[in-house]
């Protein structure tokens, strides 16, 4: 009742604001993108049903590949075509590469002291340059190779134990543990198998809360200037703050662990070690851009969101598609075992360059099941034209890479899992081919792309080399569906349980 009264009291303000906004956004000579009719105050919020990427895909099939929606007072353009994506992410990249400011992203980025959610500007450019040069360079990436391989060795050992017992394996949980172990070791120096302040279950809970926070809806985001009152009355502010507090406690524990007296830095320092060392050097050298603790936490936050669940859900999707497609499973396993031989004791990253059909399987998984089917929203910094339509300044822009990757104009039988489609194709997924953009493109391309690709490829190669896979007794392959769930990261809704059989 209190929320309803609040709405009624604020109704005149909403209507006046909406009138002013619509006049500002619709100069008579502008050609705005088409879209569904808006309702007073809420705009198109009533049109948002189901998962956002599938909802937008359905709407775009009716209103076109460049579509205008209004989330409350906020204009949002959804792009669902290769051509539109290329204009936004390449031709007009500079004008379209900022980020919208929301309550949740301000929290999780420590007031935009990160590279994932911070608006475009000098601070963002300086921080991104530092991260790419110091944390994601080739030498640093290679120095962590032993971690990626060790964690996969541990995975194979555990799966072998399950295989000997012929017991089903919960692949969602197993693959999450694999990726979380890799990311936590190389980024935070934390071994979740024997850490004092976090374990596998804690990390899973934190990742879920992280995604809950990023996807959190605040009225302030849709009704700038007046929505804060509804958030306060409804308790949404308190909810978001409580979730963020738990995440911040974990990040602070990571920092405290690194600065405690007597701690020995390993031969290969982790990401936090490197950033702490940079902070000390900047204090001495008097650099114009100075790292702060908030910058450090913001980067940790980015790694947590982009590094853990994305690769884990991709691996899970890969196993689901392969078990449902025995022809492809046999073809890729035959290639792997013929090429690498039948007597390897362990798989290394050097093996990845030898298996070509396997690479096509990974490419097809990235096409059908991008972990984040909607790229993180951008915001225009000036008036631009996309596909002939006028896009006003401060308009949010969403690229529906899921819709593009299933566009029948670009792909034959787009909903079918068929790696063979890439046999005579030069299409790649590293941001230069706009029909396939699992990591984005342009200035906002995922800086951790190489780590993500390698994590998926190495994990999947291990699973397919050492084991054959069957469904549990009493189950049928036809029982395995591809229903989706999630908000920012889209995963398989039902648990995938398979039985590993040791191949040799």
Swiss-Prot record:
GO cellular component, as recorded: membrane
Keyword Cell inner membrane: no
Known EC number: 1.14.-.-
Residues binding heme: 446
Membrane topology: Single-pass membrane protein
Main location as per UniProt: membrane
Distribution of this protein across tissues and organs: Highly expressed in rosette leaves. Also expressed in roots, leaves, flowers, and siliques.
Crosslink feature (Glycyl lysine isopeptide (Lys-Gly) (interchain with G-Cter in ubiquitin)) location: 82
Family annotation (Gene3D superfamilies): Cytochrome P450
UniProt cross-references to CDD domains, sorted A to Z: CYP71-like (cd11072)
GO MF: heme binding; iron ion binding; monooxygenase activity; oxidoreductase activity, acting on paired donors, with incorporation or reduction of molecular oxygen
Subcellular localization, as worded in the UniProt entry: Membrane
Regions that span the bilayer: 1-21
Enzyme class: oxidoreductase
InterPro entries: Cyt_P450, Cyt_P450_CS, Cyt_P450_E_grp-I, Cyt_P450_sf
Keyword tags: Heme, Iron, Isopeptide bond, Membrane, Metal-binding, Monooxygenase, Oxidoreductase, Transmembrane, Transmembrane helix, Ubl conjugation
Cofactor dependence: heme
Similarity comment: family membership: Belongs to the cytochrome P450 family.
This protein's name: Cytochrome P450 71B7
């Amino acid at each position: 009742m209190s929320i309803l009264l609040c709405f009624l009291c604020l109704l005149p303000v909403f209507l006046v604001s909406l009138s002013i906004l619509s006049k500002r956004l619709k100069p008579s000579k502008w050609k705005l993108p088409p879209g569904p009719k808006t309702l007073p105050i809420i705009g198109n919020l009533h049109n948002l049903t189901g998962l956002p990427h599938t909802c937008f895909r359905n709407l775009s099939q009716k209103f076109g590949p460049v579509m205008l929606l209004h989330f409350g007072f906020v204009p949002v353009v959804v792009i669902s075509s290769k051509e539109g994506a290329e204009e936004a992410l390449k031709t007009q990249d500079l004008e379209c590469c900022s980020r919208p400011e929301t309550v949740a992203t301000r929290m999780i980025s420590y007031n935009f002291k990160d590279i994932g959610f911070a608006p475009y500007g000098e601070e963002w450019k300086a921080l991104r340059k530092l991260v790419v040069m110091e944390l994601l360079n080739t030498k640093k990436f290679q120095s962590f190779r032993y971690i990626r391989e060790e964690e996969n060795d541990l995975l194979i050992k555990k799966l072998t134990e399950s295989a000997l017992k012929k017991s089903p394996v919960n692949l969602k949980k197993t693959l999450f543990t694999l990726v979380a172990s890799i990311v936590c070791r190389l980024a935070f120096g934390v071994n979740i198998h024997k850490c004092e302040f976090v374990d596998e279950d804690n990390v899973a809970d934190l990742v879920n809360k992280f995604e809950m926070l990023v996807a959190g809806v605040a009225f302030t985001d849709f009704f700038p200037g007046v929505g804060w009152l509804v958030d306060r009355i409804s308790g949404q502010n308190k909810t978001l703050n409580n979730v963020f507090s738990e995440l911040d406690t974990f990040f602070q524990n990571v920092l405290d662990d690194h600065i405690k007296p007597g701690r020995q830095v390993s031969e290969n320092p982790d990401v936090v070690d490197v950033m702490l060392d940079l902070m000390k050097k900047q204090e001495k050298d008097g650099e114009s851009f100075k790292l702060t603790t908030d910058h450090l936490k913001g980067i940790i936050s980015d790694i947590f969101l982009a590094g853990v669940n994305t690769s884990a859900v991709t691996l899970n999707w890969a196993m689901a598609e392969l078990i449902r497609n025995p022809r492809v499973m046999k073809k890729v396993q035959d290639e792997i075992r013929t090429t690498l031989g039948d007597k390897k004791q362990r798989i290394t990253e050097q093996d990845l360059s030898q298996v070509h059909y396997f690479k096509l399987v990974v490419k097809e998984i990235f096409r059908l099941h991008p972990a984040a089917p909607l790229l993180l929203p951008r915001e225009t910094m000036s008036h631009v034209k996309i596909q002939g339509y006028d896009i006003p300044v401060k308009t949010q822009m969403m690229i529906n890479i899921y819709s593009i990757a299933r566009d029948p104009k670009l792909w034959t039988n787009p909903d079918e899992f068929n790696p063979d489609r890439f046999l005579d194709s030069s299409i790649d997924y590293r941001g230069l081919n706009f029909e396939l953009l699992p990591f984005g493109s342009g200035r906002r391309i995922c800086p951790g792309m190489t780590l993500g690709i390698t994590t998926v490829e190495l994990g999947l190669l291990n699973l397919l080399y050492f084991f054959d896979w069957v469904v549990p007794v009493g189950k049928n392959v036809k029982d395995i569906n591809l229903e989706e769930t999630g908000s920012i990261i889209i995963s398989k809704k039902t648990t995938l349980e398979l039985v590993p059989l040791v191949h040799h």
